[in-house]
């Protein structure tokens, strides 16, 4: 079997209905939405229709709370820099140790500028250290910025409760919801989240389009300045075709949300199939609430890069948080934050499904993985099955005889 795509947390295939919605704006409606003549009208209408569709999926109270951007990374940078510009006397930021680089890189930059960054840790299952979070909240904090769902493990964070706690101390709260939107129901009007980032290409929309949710009456400073677009909050002529595509993708995600139950069933089947047929494996976030589409399993004593290469040979696309994919000799920062031992962290593989995933594809992956792992372990200097000892009380605390 070929073309089994299980890397949907990286990007998704564009839905044919999304492409169909975009085509008129690539072919026929080429006017500038800011223009008052007839060529601008259809583009302006498409822009506002998409804004309504995005607001509906996010459960926003007002369509004006949606600001279109080029991507979620831009939205996240905008949120962070806006918050610190509005509270220059507050020189602390709270984030987590397992954020996406879009957040971590900005925080590292600000740390070099003199900001104190509180990086909230996680347990070995990826659960947030809430006690550490509450201790870090103070009048010196300008912003809390954290993800709703982790991109590597799928573990969900209690962002609604975290946002309420931040508000009680007068702190703005931003959420990176890239991996949550379209996979779990979201109602922002029922939360205290001030700002939220999301992306079109993670929900079967086009690349090059994202948005920032900005709660009404939240003070704001734009990052991209120039024209009056997006009510003066994000300058630059809008990517109308991309925005229309994002709107269509959001509407379809809303319609197909019930399908996430069947996606979760396939995810569970994949987990069970791999864990029961391959020894010395660990499911990341096994006992934590997770997105319904994400499986991250560590296969001990082998490298994730080698697994991916052999999977690709079998026509299966997946992803790894191990050293190879980042060009580093270390496992991913998420695996290290979870304190996953060396021999397991290097062999972690993420399989991420979508509503386009089929059961036969899951069965094909289950069939191929045992042989792949067995072949690689015969080449591993760490794999001496008759000498591996499992320490009492933990699957991954090996000693070598």
From Swiss-Prot:
Pfam families xref list: Aminotran_5
Cystine crosslinks: none
EC nos: 2.8.1.7
Co-factor requirement: pyridoxal 5'-phosphate
Functional summary from the UniProt entry: Catalyzes the removal of elemental sulfur atoms from cysteine to produce alanine. Seems to participate in the biosynthesis of the nitrogenase metalloclusters by providing the inorganic sulfur required for the Fe-S core formation.
N6-(pyridoxal phosphate)lysine sites (modified residues): 202
Catalytic activity: (sulfur carrier)-H + L-cysteine = (sulfur carrier)-SH + L-alanine
Key words of the record: Iron, Iron-sulfur, Metal-binding, Nitrogen fixation, Plasmid, Pyridoxal phosphate, Transferase
BP-aspect Gene Ontology terms: amino acid metabolic process; nitrogen fixation
GO function terms (MF aspect): cysteine desulfurase activity; iron-sulfur cluster binding; metal ion binding; pyridoxal phosphate binding
Enzyme class, UniProt record, top EC level: transferase
Binding site for [2Fe-2S] cluster: 324
Name of the molecule in the record: Cysteine desulfurase
Protein residues bound to pyridoxal 5'-phosphate: 72-73, 151, 179, 199-201, 237
Active site: 324 (cysteine persulfide intermediate)
Species assigned in the record: Enterobacter agglomerans (Erwinia herbicola)
UniProt-listed SUPFAM superfamilies: PLP-dependent transferases
Gene3D superfamilies assigned to the protein according to its UniProt record, in alphabetical order: 1.10.260.50, Aspartate Aminotransferase, domain 1 (3.90.1150.10), Type I PLP-dependent aspartate aminotransferase-like (Major domain) (3.40.640.10)
Family: Belongs to the class-V pyridoxal-phosphate-dependent aminotransferase family. NifS/IscS subfamily.
């Amino acid at each position: 079997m070929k073309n089994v795509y299980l890397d949907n947390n990286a990007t998704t295939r564009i839905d044919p209905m999304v492409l169909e919605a975009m085509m008129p704006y690539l072919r026929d409606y080429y006017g500038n939405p800011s223009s008052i003549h007839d060529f601008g009208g259809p583009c302006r209408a498409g822009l506002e229709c998409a804004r309504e569709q995005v607001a509906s999926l996010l459960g926003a109270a007002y369509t004006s709370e949606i600001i279109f951007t080029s991507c979620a990374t831009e939205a996240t940078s905008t949120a962070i820099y806006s918050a610190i510009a509005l509270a220059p006397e507050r020189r602390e930021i709270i984030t987590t140790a397992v954020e996406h680089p879009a957040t971590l890189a900005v925080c590292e930059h600000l740390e070099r500028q003199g900001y104190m960054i509180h990086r909230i840790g996680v347990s070995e299952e990826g659960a947030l250290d809430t006690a550490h979070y509450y201790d870090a909240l103070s009048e010196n904090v300008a912003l809390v910025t954290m993800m709703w769902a982790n991109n590597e493990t799928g573990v969900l964070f209690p962002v609604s409760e975290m946002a309420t706690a931040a508000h009680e101390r007068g702190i703005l709260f931003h959420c990176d919801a890239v991996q949550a939107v379209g996979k779990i129901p979201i109602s922002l009007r029922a939360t205290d989240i001030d700002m939220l980032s999301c992306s079109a290409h993670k929900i079967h929309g086009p690349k090059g389009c994202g948005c920032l949710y900005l709660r009404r009456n939240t003070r704001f400073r734009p990052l991209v300045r120039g024209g009056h677009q997006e009510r003066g909050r994000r300058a630059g002529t809008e990517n109308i075709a991309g925005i229309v595509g994002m709107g269509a993708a959001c509407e379809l995600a809303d319609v197909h949300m019930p399908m996430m139950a069947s996606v979760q069933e396939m995810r569970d089947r994949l987990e069970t199939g791999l864990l029961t047929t391959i020894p010395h494996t660990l499911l990341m976030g096994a006992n934590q609430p997770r997105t319904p589409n994400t499986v991250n399993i560590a296969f001990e004593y082998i490298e994730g890069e080698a697994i991916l290469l052999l999977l690709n040979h079998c026509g299966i696309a997946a992803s790894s948080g191990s050293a190879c994919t980042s060009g580093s000799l270390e496992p991913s920062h998420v695996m290290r934050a979870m304190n996953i031992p060396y021999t397991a962290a290097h062999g972690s593989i993420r399989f991420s499904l979508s509503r386009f995933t089929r059961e036969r594809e899951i069965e094909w992956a289950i069939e191929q993985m045992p042989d792949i792992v067995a072949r690689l372990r015969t080449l591993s200097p760490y794999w001496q099955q008759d000498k591996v000892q499992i320490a009492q009380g933990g699957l991954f605390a090996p000693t070598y005889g």
